[in-house]
Amino acid sequence: MSTAAPRSRRHGRVRWWTYLMLSAATVACLFPLYWMFIVATTDTATATQMPPEVVPGGNFFALAGLVMETVPFVQALLNSLFVATAIGVGQAVLCALAGYAFAKLAFPGRNVLFLIVLLTMTVPTQLSVIPQYMIMSELGWVDTLQALVVPGLASAFGIFWMRQHITATISDELMQAARIDGANSWQVFWRIAFPIVRPAAFVLGLFGFVTAWNDFLWPFIVLKSPERYTAQIAIKALQNSYDVDLGLAMSGSFMATVPLVALFVLVGRRMVAGILEGAFKG
């Protein structure tokens, strides 16, 4: 026993080089955001000089005001918030519902349909732009926010994610017990299955939120009016056809990044816990 205790203490002790590696990784991850802020507080000449400037300047609020004057940036942030929130919530609920159906409900063609869902993950997103735009045009949704929300309410990856998680975490005996008590399929899902897989659905919703917030290609194609721009399209509108004002562009980019950083600070611990829970249970 005298030799086991020191050995366990040695294994439980964190080495100094572990902290060094974690600190280096943290600096590497945060440096792009810091550099973005530096450029957002200076002009293009200062941003491109050699050696580069490493101390923030004093022009951030002036450039931020210029961003607001150039494009309706606050409205763009609100549009992005609405679209990203709707897509995040929609994916969390609808993908969980579809994953539950593929995992626990028996119906003709279940395996074939799930295989088709998986095959759609192999199709590049760019190939769906033209038919998707044609559908939006027929519906009269071009230059509307629902053209961004509706196509993103479900995803093949989200359905696969939730199907695997539900298969691993919800037993058939639990569902049978609920059905014996008189619950129908919807009640089993909403009152039993969904509360159990809520952490995984929460993580999926966050992934959907971040993806929708950072999306550029589809909003750039379908949106025409400045008052309906999302944050990424508003940043593109800050650039003209001939040159790029780096300070102006980075000021808009920094203001569009701050909400994501704040979101991660608020829910980062819960997101990591949801990912680890799915990893251990799977």
PLM regions: where:
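Short, Lys/Arg-rich, polar N-terminal cytosolic tail immediately upstream
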Residues: 1-11
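A structural signal for multi-pass alpha-helical bundles of membrane permease subunits
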Residues: 14-282
